[in-house]
Structure formats: C-alpha cells, structure tokens
Amino acid sequence: MTAIKLIVGLGNPGAEYEQTRHNAGALFVERIAHAQNVNLVADRKYFGLTGRFSHQGQDVRLLIPTTYMNRSGQAVAALAGFFRIKPEEILVAHDELDLPPGVAKLKVGGGHGGHNGLRDIIAQLGNQNTFHRLRLGIGHPGVASMVSNFVLGRAPRAEQEKLDASIDFALGVLPDILAGEWNRAMKNLHSQKA
C-alpha cells in the first residue's frame, strides 16, 4: 500500500505537440492541476512544469517534463532525487499504443514496452522500474513504420473524446491511487471503457 507522492505526465513541449496522442499523460496531469486549483510553473531545476497540492495531509507533486519525450527521465530523476521520492511512490501517466482509445489501465513496475519516455525514466532512476504507470490507450496504427507519425499526430474528434473519457475515469480513482489503494483503483478503473 504505497501512497503516491509524485505524478508525472509525459509529453513533448511546444505548441506543435499540444493535443497530440503522445501528450496524453501531460493532459492527465493538466486535468489534475485544474481540479486541484494548482498552477503548473516552469522550473528549470526540475526540467519541467511543476505544481503541488495536499491530499490527506500529504504533499503530492505534479510534473510535466519540458524535455522531449526521450529525455523525460532527466526531469523525473531531478525532482524525485531532490524530494527523496522513491520510485514506488511515483505514478507516470503515458500514452499506450497497446490499448484502444477510451481504455485506461494501471500497472505496477515492468519494462518500457518500447516507450521512449519510460525507457529514459527507468535509466535515469538507476534501472529501477518499480514506479507505477497509468496507461492511457491511444490505439495502434496497425503498422510499426507508422507509429512515429501516429503518436505525434492529433486524434480525430471521436478518438479524442474517448481519450478524454478515459482520463475522467482515471481522475475518478485518483483518491485511491494517492492513498495506495491499488487493488480498489485497478478494479474500478479496469472495469470502465468509453
């Protein structure tokens, strides 16, 4: 029952990447910040946009790395190191090709599955992969050679609405996630699909 002290939302910086599939994790953190009335502020020390709120007397930090996706670990390691946050106290929200739009799944630990942001976080945390993940389904283009353009593209409206719904589902179980009630959070989240 590990409580979460840091929520990271992966994406790429800049207007050209806003609302792209690859920025699904960043969108999740933006939605948390909005719900908690937190202003995300650029902080060069942590290579990202950061914020903080309190949940049941515990500080919860938010981070959207402003490095490019493949350097996300630089931001995560800097913030987690400074505040002495252990890998198992971190939740990383990211886009997931292996899930359809409208589906969100929680996962504890594991490999990077080809995701460059996760790959760099694992490396920068000293090859520790025990952090939690929120996998936000974006679907797969069907052909490996199309993946790069697919993740860096904007989803059609119907797909975006499903992604937004999956983020809503994840926000609904956020209190359980923050409290470390992983079984309850997984049961509730995994039973929902847009």
Swiss-Prot record:
Q: Gene3D superfamilies this protein is in?
A: Peptidyl-tRNA hydrolase (3.40.50.1470)
> What Gene Ontology molecular-function terms does this entry list?
peptidyl-tRNA hydrolase activity; tRNA binding
Q: Catalytic site residues?
A: H22
PROSITE patterns assigned to the protein according to its UniProt record, in alphabetical order:
PEPT_TRNA_HYDROL_1 (PS01195), PEPT_TRNA_HYDROL_2 (PS01196)
Record flagged with keyword Flavoprotein: no
Q: Where does tRNA bind?
A: Y17, Y68, N70, N116
Q: Which Pfam families match?
A: Pept_tRNA_hydro
Q: Does the keyword Amino-acid biosynthesis apply?
A: no
Domain of life, source organism = Bacteria
Q: Which reaction does it catalyse?
A: an N-acyl-L-alpha-aminoacyl-tRNA + H2O = an N-acyl-L-amino acid + a tRNA + H(+)
* Task performed by this protein: Hydrolyzes ribosome-free peptidyl-tRNAs (with 1 or more amino acids incorporated), which drop off the ribosome during protein synthesis, or as a result of ribosome stalling.
Q: Which family does it belong to?
A: Belongs to the PTH family.
Q: Subunit notes for this chain?
A: Monomer.
Instruction: Write the protein's name.
Output: Peptidyl-tRNA hydrolase
**Where does this protein come from, organism-wise?**
Pseudomonas fluorescens (strain Pf0-1)
- What are the leading ranks of the lineage? Bacteria, Pseudomonadati, Pseudomonadota, Gammaproteobacteria, Pseudomonadales
The protein's gene is named pth
